């Protein structure tokens, strides 16, 4: 299945999706190792390590951009797919050099799906559907 969205940050990555149905704040929401520590998150206790993070949109502090940058530079966060990207998440992905596509119907993607995020064209492919 192929979903057409909007390119925010360039690059192409294939990997396993981890999907949240709730908006996410990177400041206080995730630790340095990529573990989700926000107790209000539907992904509390899970890890972003080596995954493509799919969530509706970001919320919270501008420091979140630097958290995303740090996760990307440590090789923990591989890519992002949003329903609606906002400047904090966009800045972090661009600085971190990870692909980001938004305007995607994230309801089509499930945790564990193998996906390809093409930040050059704005396309997300779900390989196992």
UniProtKB/Swiss-Prot annotation:
The signal peptide annotation in the UniProt record is none
What pathway is this protein said to act in by its record?
Isoprenoid biosynthesis; isopentenyl diphosphate biosynthesis via mevalonate pathway
Name the domain of life: Archaea
Which BP terms in the Gene Ontology apply to this protein?
A: isopentenyl diphosphate biosynthetic process, mevalonate pathway
- MF (Gene Ontology): hydro-lyase activity
Annotated function: Component of a hydro-lyase that catalyzes the dehydration of mevalonate 5-phosphate (MVA5P) to form trans-anhydromevalonate 5-phosphate (tAHMP). Involved in the archaeal mevalonate (MVA) pathway, which provides fundamental precursors for isoprenoid biosynthesis, such as isopentenyl diphosphate (IPP) and dimethylallyl diphosphate (DMAPP).
Quaternary context: Heterodimer composed of a large subunit (PMDh-L) and a small subunit (PMDh-S).
Similarity section: Belongs to the AcnX type II small subunit family.
Q: What is this protein called?
A: Phosphomevalonate dehydratase small subunit
Task: Name its species.
Answer: Methanocaldococcus jannaschii (strain ATCC 43067 / DSM 2661 / JAL-1 / JCM 10045 / NBRC 100440)
